[in-house]
Curated annotation (Swiss-Prot):
GO biological process, one term: heme A biosynthetic process
Cofactor: heme b
Name recorded for this polypeptide: Heme A synthase
InterPro entries according to UniProt: COX15/CtaA_fam, HemeA_Synthase_type2
Catalytic activity: Fe(II)-heme o + 2 A + H2O = Fe(II)-heme a + 2 AH2
Subcellular location: Cell membrane
Membrane-spanning parts: 12-32, 97-117, 130-150, 161-181, 194-214, 256-276, 285-305, 310-330
Topology with respect to the bilayer: Multi-pass membrane protein
Pfam families in the record: COX15-CtaA
Role of this protein: Catalyzes the conversion of heme O to heme A by two successive hydroxylations of the methyl group at C8. The first hydroxylation forms heme I, the second hydroxylation results in an unstable dihydroxymethyl group, which spontaneously dehydrates, resulting in the formyl group of heme A.
GO molecular function: metal ion binding; oxidoreductase activity, acting on NAD(P)H, heme protein as acceptor
Quaternary structure and partners: Interacts with CtaB.
Keywords of this entry: Cell membrane, Heme biosynthesis, Iron, Membrane, Metal-binding, Oxidoreductase, Transmembrane, Transmembrane helix
Amino acid sequence: MFVNSDNYIKYLKLWLITLFSLIVLMVAVGGLTRLTDSGLSITAWELFTGILPPMNINEWNFYFTEYKKIPEYKNINYGMSLDEFKVIFYWEYAHRLLARFVGLFTLVPLLFFTLYFKKTLHYSNKYYWIFFLVCLQGFIGWYMVSSGLIENNDVSHFRLSIHLSLALFILCLIFWYILDIHKIKKFENKIPNLFLLFILKLIVLQIVLGAFLSGLDGGLIYNSWPDMNGSFFPNDVSYGDLITTQLFNNPSIIQFLHRSTAYLLLFFIIILNFIYFKKQYDFKYVLFFDVAILFQIFLGIITLISGVEITYASLHQLGSILVLSSYFLILYKNSN
């Protein structure tokens, strides 16, 4: 019934595209969980329990009592009502429930493919890497949450950046597999790989800085553009602070670096456009990337000026997926 190569490719494409979409949704929910300060509302991992939300007042009181023990409640949300707690609880609950579903949706089809298509021509075990990374992401998610349960009012921005970066890496890996299955035609004349990798490193750096900024609530200060409240450099720090050990813990410096990296990235993307013109490639690929970058910059500015309005901030985070996907299309076209 199932065992032929054409069926395998058809099911594989459907699975990868659906999985990609689910993880995009999970990133969106995770971002909203962060933006609504909901991530610490469930104080235990509950890997195999907690599938159902609290069903009665006693269960709600249990979760609320546990939340009252952590610094975030004592120092920030003291006096919060149970109804207010339910709002932040459901954001974190939705994120965890979706994560469980993604884990199952990754493993079950993989087992199905192994059972029915292992002897077909195009079968590969490489897709199990996705499941491994999804499991790793679950551990890192709890590692992140645990950093805000004992001494800190919030999660570590370093661990937050790891959590977001791994989610985006998983998406890029899945997207690469999708391109590979569709056998997208490659460029005949290659762009220098070192230059493309340099731009990729800048994009990754910008995403990490964005995660730092979010974790430090650094978007709530210097809400002006292109200046930083009337100056080029934040006025509450000095240039000497750029070489101190507290460099990545200072929200003012992180915002300055996030802005500066965006300008630097834009400069090298202009160079990339000139290379495209010179080599006379199909311009639609770089145009797609250009639009993604410009849209992301626009969203970043609007998010900043608005004082991190949730809708703009959420779209700005999702914009990083569009930027990475459009750039990985260029990387794939340029690969051997």
